[in-house]
Every structure is written in structure tokens, then in C-alpha cells.
UniProtKB/Swiss-Prot annotation:
SUPFAM superfamilies reported for this sequence: Ribosomal protein S7
Keywords, alphabetical: Chloroplast, Plastid, Ribonucleoprotein, Ribosomal protein, RNA-binding, rRNA-binding
A Pfam family hit: Ribosomal_S7
Identification of the protein by name: Small ribosomal subunit protein uS7c
Quaternary data: Part of the 30S ribosomal subunit.
GO MF, one annotated term: structural constituent of ribosome
Sequence similarity: Belongs to the universal ribosomal protein uS7 family.
GO-annotated biological processes: translation
HAMAP family, A to Z: Ribosomal_uS7_B (MF_00480_B)
This protein's GO CC annotations: chloroplast; small ribosomal subunit
Species for this entry: Schisandra chinensis
Lineage, top ranks: Eukaryota, Viridiplantae, Streptophyta, Embryophyta, Tracheophyta
């Protein structure tokens, strides 16, 4: 058994303008090559576009989109007796949010469009409405977990 002790879980910081942790998580995931100011620009432009499109509070749209995409259950590959099984496991809230943000950004990067802010805002609005690639990814993950329910006892 390790003598080091467990690492303290860091609390997510808030972003400077909206004072929102989800926005900061989004910024840290969209970040490429250490260009954080560019990541903030993209997010804030996307939030403005959401405001123009929906005429609702953009942070509530963001929250709704992330809540809609967050998976409850996922599958994890586990090797048992020479064969690999996809074992369904429950996902915690923090890990679920991280997965949701990753899926939203991946889906928005694949979208055709002018710039990342436009694509991200479109994907977030679609996810809040219950459609889009990120929602499809969540449903696919849930289907995989349901199909492999027989292997749940390998957990």
C-alpha cells in the first residue's frame, strides 16, 4: 500500500467574465498550443452568438446542453480469461461533464462552417434542443452499455 496519501482534488476555477466553472472547463478543453487568450475569444464569441440565436440566457443554454450530453453510464474494456469484454460502468458527475465537453467540442470541430465560434454555438444550441452529433454520441454510448449489460458483474 502506498504511503504517499491521495492527491487533493482541485476545484475548478471560474472564468473572469461570467464567473462560471463550466465556461472555464470549456476554455481549458478548447485550448491548443497554450493559446488561452484565443480560447477565451472563441468561447465568448460563441456565447454572444448563442445570445443572438436563442434570445435566452446563453449560460443556461450552455448548462442545458452539457446536462443533455452528460452520460450516466459508459463501457470500459476489461480483459477476462483471454477475451476482452466491454463492461458497463457508472460515471461520476465530474467525469461525465468532462466527457460531455469533449464530445461537444469534437462534434463542433467536425461541423462545416466559417469559424470555431460559429460551429461551437450551433452545436451547443442543437445539444440544448436535444439533437446534434454530441447527443448522438451519448445515445450510442448508452446503447453500448445496454447491449453489454450481461458483463456488468465483471466490474
Amino acid at each position: 500500500m502506498s504511503r504517499r496519501g491521495t492527491a487533493e482534488e482541485k476545484t475548478a476555477k471560474s472564468d473572469p467574465i461570467y464567473r462560471n466553472r463550466l465556461v472555464n472547463m470549456l476554455v481549458n478543453r478548447i485550448l491548443k498550443h497554450g493559446k488561452k487568450s484565443l480560447a477565451y475569444q472563441i468561447i465568448y464569441r460563441a456565447v454572444k452568438k448563442i445570445q443572438q440565436k436563442t434570445e435566452a440566457n446563453p449560460l443556461s443554454v450552455l448548462r442545458q446542453a452539457i446536462r443533455g450530453v452528460t452520460p450516466d453510464i459508459a463501457v470500459k474494456a476489461r480483459r477476462v480469461g483471454g477475451s476482452t469484454h466491454q463492461v458497463p460502468i457508472e460515471i461520476g458527475s465530474t467525469q461525465g461533464k468532462a466527457l460531455a465537453i469533449r464530445w461537444l467540442l469534437g462534434a463542433s470541430r467536425k461541423r462545416p462552417g466559417r469559424n470555431m465560434a460559429f460551429k461551437l454555438s450551433s452545436e451547443l444550441v442543437d445539444a440544448a434542443k436535444g439533437s446534434g452529433d454530441a447527443i448522438r454520441k451519448k445515445e450510442e454510448t448508452h446503447r453500448m452499455a445496454e447491449a453489454n449489460r450481461a458483463f456488468a458483474h465483471f466490474r
